[in-house]
Amino acid sequence: MALLRGVFIVAAKRTPFGAYGGLLKDFTATDLTEFAARAALSAGKVPPETIDSVIVGNVMQSSSDAAYLARHVGLRVGVPTETGALTLNRLCGSGFQSIVSGCQEICSKDAEVVLCGGTESMSQSPYSVRNVRFGTKFGLDLKLEDTLWAGLTDQHVKLPMGMTAENLAAKYNISREDCDRYALQSQQRWKAANEAGYFNEEMAPIEVKTKKGKQTMQVDEHARPQTTLEQLQNLPPVFKKEGTVTAGNASGMSDGAGVVIIASEDAVKKHNFTPLARVVGYFVSGCDPAIMGIGPVPAITGALKKAGLSLKDMDLIDVNEAFAPQFLAVQKSLDLDPSKTNVSGGAIALGHPLGGSGSRITAHLVHELRRRGGKYAVGSACIGGGQGISLIIQNTA
């Protein structure tokens, strides 16, 4: 929808994204959000006591404190005890949804300043044993369930997420070569943006322990900037014989978090915040679960229609790269301009910590739009189970 009140982004930060089992594996999703929240509060000069609500998106609930996630983040960073907190889950759209829900609270005047976040520690996703709480039968083998793999499989249509991408490849005539070439482009664009310092404004460095002692992590760990097309072409398909999806052209499992602080126009004036961008509108749409990756098409189309804008008005477009064929299907459907779409690479390069990607995309669009002097940007993600979500922002510089 288009917003009923003026809502502005006054801070947007994210952690570097860690590789699966990498440098961030010992930090919980709560820890990661705390790092991003502290950085956002500091960068936006937002006193914690001005926060009226804390909303954090998280999917896997992978740590023992996950049920308390948003509440603990607020308390850790000094938000008043009286301020409420909500942990939500719209799967891969959770980071975007935290901002959408924050906008709704501001538009209904339930809040004036909201700390919105998205986070995931995929590395900490546990194995579980079901049906043992009330005892087991003699001789019954206990089965360990990988909660991460289970979460990436849609039991309703009995398809792993990768197969939904294969369905899109077949429907839109997308070849394996198309996918590998796009994956290479994602890595190369990430490399160019990283070397140019284009992630610096959004990044919240983290001190990590390594074999060489403590060091500051400020670069995404999953990216493989030296990747070649030949290397990508040599990888086997994962989900289907002669398929298109490989480990090299799918988003990387990773760990990371982002925080976007939003405020009403009244709060911006009252607290003298510096608005970085205005939230123009958003849209959520359902789609066929068997081709869930096409979700950004109705989501982006719906958001633009509500806002009275078109794709030509957008200076930047960022669609989460869950899988190369999924992104290419969206690009083909909407006829997206490659020169302004995913300009700094995407999840194929830097990883997709489920709940964190919407926050990461929004933070990057905020700062990249300002760097380029553009006016409008739209970010979007497909969502397992068959949904899409999108968010339109406007540069206030």
Swiss-Prot record:
Identify which residues the record assigns to the active site: C92 (acyl-thioester intermediate), C382 (proton donor/acceptor)
Pfam families according to UniProt? Thiolase_C, Thiolase_N
Reaction(s) this enzyme catalyzes, per UniProt:
an acyl-CoA + acetyl-CoA = a 3-oxoacyl-CoA + CoA; 2 acetyl-CoA = acetoacetyl-CoA + CoA; acetyl-CoA + H2O = acetate + CoA + H(+); propanoyl-CoA + H2O = propanoate + CoA + H(+)
Q: Does the keyword S-adenosyl-L-methionine apply?
A: no
Q: Which residues carry this modification: Phosphothreonine?
A: T119, T136
Q: Which PROSITE patterns match?
A: THIOLASE_1 (PS00098), THIOLASE_2 (PS00737), THIOLASE_3 (PS00099)
Where on the chain is N6-succinyllysine found, per UniProt?
Answer: K25, K45, K137, K143, K158, K171, K191, K209, K211, K212, K214, K240, K305, K312
Q: Which residue interval is the transit peptide?
A: 1-16
Sites marked Increases nucleophilicity of active site Cys = H352
Pathway listed for it is: Lipid metabolism; fatty acid beta-oxidation
Q: Which residues carry this modification: Phosphotyrosine?
A: Y127
Describe, from its UniProt entry, the tissues in which this protein is expressed: Expressed in liver, brown adipose tissue and heart (at protein level).
Q: What is this protein called?
A: 3-ketoacyl-CoA thiolase, mitochondrial
Source organism per UniProt: Rattus norvegicus (Rat)
